[in-house]
Design a protein with these regions (language model features):
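Conserved beta-strand segments of alpha/beta enzyme cores
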Residues: 2, 87-90, 149-151, 274
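Short acidic-hydrophobic, aromatic-tinged amphipathic segments that line or gate anion-handling sites
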Residues: 2-9, 69, 90
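N-terminal catalytic cores of NTP/NDP-binding nucleotidyl/phosphoryl-transfer enzymes
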Residues: 11-73
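Residue-level signal for inorganic ion chemistry
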Residues: 28, 81, 120, 181, ...
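Cofactor-binding loop segments of dinucleotide-utilizing enzymes, especially the Rossmann-like FAD-
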Residues: 54, 94, 155
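N-terminal Rossmann-like or analogous alpha/beta NTP/dinucleotide-binding catalytic cores
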Residues: 60-146
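Glycine-rich, Lys/Arg-enriched anion-binding loops that position phosphate/diphosphate groups
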Residues: 135, 140-245, 318
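Phosphate/ribose-recognition catalytic cores of enzymes acting on nucleotide-derived substrates
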Residues: 198-318
Length: 318
């Protein structure tokens, strides 16, 4: 996938193209259906297929208090877009200057000017330009002026009628329903970050953990224990992951993401790792004794092994 992180980076003769425009947070099954349609339209007309997206949610600038947490970082989003087989992605920096560009100027500068757009695929509720002044009707009018066609794509809905959306995925993750979220995302939801030194309590209890730093990427699911895969240098390890503030111990006010890799005891401090969530195991509980916590951690390991299909490590015979 060709990646352009500014209009100036787009080669002069890159077009003509078919495009779709949006945040694409999560790159979920609804997004993928749109991108599949984009590829079809582009192939039928001999055009390149291009996604136009933003480096952040525009609401983070326009209405920060109402802006939801992103499901993915910009880097994660681009990686997932690359798996959709589109020809290119143009990432626009959504700053104050871009927010004040009129709908007409956005079309003439970005769509017609930089990309030489011939087809635009959008949803029925698509808005663009300063203060969201542009809608599908205006886009069609501008298409007649600049020589592109507008194709409106229907939303993708589940069997029960719920629209597939980033908001829905965020709701599922907020409830710990990572397996259901994965179905909509067409991949395991993941977070990534650098492993930092924690309080070493897990190691003292016989369950050393990799603690992610505060600046981890990706939406953190609900507090609880999860079966997951810990990815280190491209290698996946079965893991029990704890999210929360360790209620059994005092003095842990901040939410932590900790991964215990089964049957592993390695030094990965300072490494950038990824956690792929598979299934929710249980909620966080405050135990009255350390022994009770250790007993539960043993049960958690059994549950995680069963979920991930990882047999217990055999104890060498004496």
């Amino acid at each position: 996938m060709d990646l352009f992180e500014s209009l100036d980076a787009v080669p002069e003769a890159y077009g003509p193209v078919a495009i779709t425009i949006g945040k694409f947070d999560g790159v979920h099954s609804g997004h993928r259906a749109v991108l599949a349609r984009l590829r079809e339209v582009a192939a039928d007309r001999g055009l390149r297929s291009v996604v136009v997206t933003f480096d952040r949610n525009p609401m983070s600038l326009l209405n920060p208090a109402a802006c939801p947490q992103p499901l993915l970082s910009k880097e994660q989003k681009l990686e997932r877009l690359a798996t959709t087989d589109v020809d290119g992605s143009l990432v626009l920096t959504f700053d104050r200057a871009l927010s004040e560009v009129s709908a007409e100027d956005f079309v003439s500068t970005v769509l017609a000017g930089a990309l030489d757009t011939k087809v635009v695929l959008v949803g029925a509720d698509f808005r663009f330009g300063a203060r969201g002044a542009g809608d599908v009707a205006l886009l069609r009018e501008l298409g007649e002026v600049h020589g592109f066609e507008v194709v409106v794509i229907d939303d993708i809905a589940l069997e029960e009628g719920r629209r597939v959306s980033s908001t829905f995925v965020r709701e599922l993750l907020s409830e710990g329903r990572v397996a259901e979220a994965a179905q909509l995302l067409t991949a395991a939801h993941s977070v990534r970050g650098v492993v930092v030194l924690g309080q070493q309590r897990g190691r003292e209890l016989g369950y050393p953990t990799a603690n992610l730093d505060r600046n981890s990427e990706g939406f953190i699911p609900a507090d609880g224990v999860y079966a997951a895969w810990l990815v280190v240098d491209g290698v996946r390890f079965a893991a029990a992951v704890s999210i929360g503030n360790n209620p059994t111990f005092d003095g842990v006010p901040e939410k932590q993401v900790e991964a215990h890799a089964l049957d592993q005891d390695f030094d990965i401090y300072g490494k950038r790792v990824e956690i792929e969530f598979v299934e929710y195991v249980r909620g966080m509980v405050k135990y009255t004794t350390v022994e009770a916590l250790i007993d539960q951690m043993c049960l958690d390991e059994v549950a995680v092994r069963e979920i991930l299909g990882v047999p217990a490590k055999e104890t060498p015979k004496k």
